[in-house]
Amino acid sequence: MSFAVVRMQKMKSYDLKGIQFHNQRERESKTNPDIDKERSHENYDLVNDEPIDYNERVKEIIESQKVGTRKTRKDAVLVNELIVTSDRHFFERLDPDEQKRFFEESYKLFADRYGKQNIAYATVHVDEKTPHMHLGVVPMRDGKLQGKNVFNRQELLWLQDKFPEHMQKLGFDLQRGEKGSDREHIETSKFKKQTLEKEIDLLENELKNKKSELAILSEEVSGEFKIPVKREKKSVEVPTGKRNLLGIEQKKTVMKSTGNVILKDEVFQDLKQKVKAGAVLQTRVDQLLNTDYAKENQSLKKEVKELRSTNKSLSEENGRLKSTVEHLTNEIESLYVLTKDFLKARTNDLESFKELFGVFVGKVKEKAPRGLFVRQHERSEEKKNTFSLQDVLQRDRELREQRKAKRKKSHDLER
């Protein structure tokens, strides 16, 4: 049975444009090789028939419900995006209609819980390796943005418990992730890593655009003007500090700046216009450097750096967890074989061994229904039920040994 995945991500104002580009495939992704461009036209939105401007749509939702005149804080969480999905094997078992029903039923559940009027978008991506839905919830409650109250710890637990339960009732073969299991930890870390890579891509694109705009403005301001001038310098005599034979101080002629230039009127007027235009452009650049763009650029750079660091940590954590799980799996497999050998050596026949081992496995199953030991036993039983010549020969050897032991025991009794 596959696991249900619902992950919540907070979005502030400067995040919306980037996630809009990603969700609506408005720009080519450089860091997500999983996107199949030839299938991007199959993506769809359960809320909007056409592409939208995320900032405008979110603003409409807030303004239509807001109570009072207080402005929304610049650093407020405007959208809580839910990413709804499962593993690839789950979707491979569903035909296209059932896949769409899965996302439609998920959307209905969240629209009922958080208010249909608060759902800004519900974009389904089928052009990546695993289909998934980005569902944007504007956390409005009682006329105010209340992200912390709408999506508190209890609500996140509700998402993890009730979503798979609800989808099971609708006929989907899903279960909640095992609490505290290594599998859940690895899957969550992997999903976070993929999501962070997408966020980095979006932030880098946004940063690149803003840098380009600043570069264009700077070039316009710093452009050099070639000005035809006259009488910029004049010839003057200056003392050399030496005297001739008659004692008269010697002088030399040099070109010295007059501090003035003579321009044609048309050149002068053109220069005035360019100076004014340059002053206006310089003012715009100064405003950009001292206000929103510069601050946002610095914020984006910092966030990209933090995301890269987090991404690296998650990759390292994934590696450690995979290694740990691999070691544990090997240890459990060895323990399983040793347990069978131990019990087999202390029972008289195959039937007694099977009964005793079955009781032992049953007790383990009560403590850990989906533990590695139980799963190893299930794999062993499946393999045992598969007919092979090697199994027949092994069974024949066991029967021969049993008959030999019985004959020896009978012979000893007769003596």
UniProtKB/Swiss-Prot annotation:
The keyword DNA damage does not apply. Transmembrane segments: none annotated. Keywords: DNA-binding, Plasmid. InterPro entries: Mob_Pre. Residues 23-39 have a biased composition (Basic and acidic residues). The keyword DNA-binding applies. GO terms for biological process: DNA recombination. The interaction of the RSA site and the pre protein may not only serve a function in plasmid maintenance, but also contribute to the distribution of small antibiotic resistance plasmids among Gram-positive bacteria. Belongs to the plasmid mobilization pre family. Contains conserved positively charged amino acids probably involved in the binding of the pre protein to the RSA site. This is Plasmid recombination enzyme. It comes from Bacillus sp. The gene is pre.
